């Protein structure tokens, strides 16, 4: 089950962004940047930035998420968003004795497909652990033959075994990560990944992340979501044709945030 938490963010992110904008458009000194930046003036600066398309000040606000229960398939997609920082659970240093995996909804919905998928995952788990054990025993024997004490040899062999045994793990295998993005990168991420044409798992993640950051910085993310929330759909012939429904959905999310 996917779990997402907002574990840290820039303190007063909207005020920080407004201060950066104030510096750009006035002769204010660094020591005076925060003076007079009440909620109303902060909101005006942020609206101005959005109207002008001046996005660089928004980069001063960052958000850090803890994410688990997602697949390695998702990992391959989210790391394409390059202006971000990722720390991912290592399959090299962590032995996956408790093999967890993500079942796609379309597979879950078809009993025959689900049965075949679960059988495949069970077989993959067995092969992974069997291969890891064989590699560990082989590496231990080699290291001991080279003169290394058994306890030290087994510790080193275990890590070496994980390094190669992981090659049999499927894309469905669960992973955990900590991800940090600045607000501008998040806007782009939501623009692309909240779209109904995005792959289902990363779309679910993007929607959860949006739901977490919007209450913290509602003016920064006022026009965030899929592209059609704030303008015409850019997908052309690939458009889902549900722009009105999507806009209503995101209006509801924002209303529920109570800000």
Where is each model-derived feature located?
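Family-specific signature for flavin-dependent thymidylate synthase
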Residues: 1-259
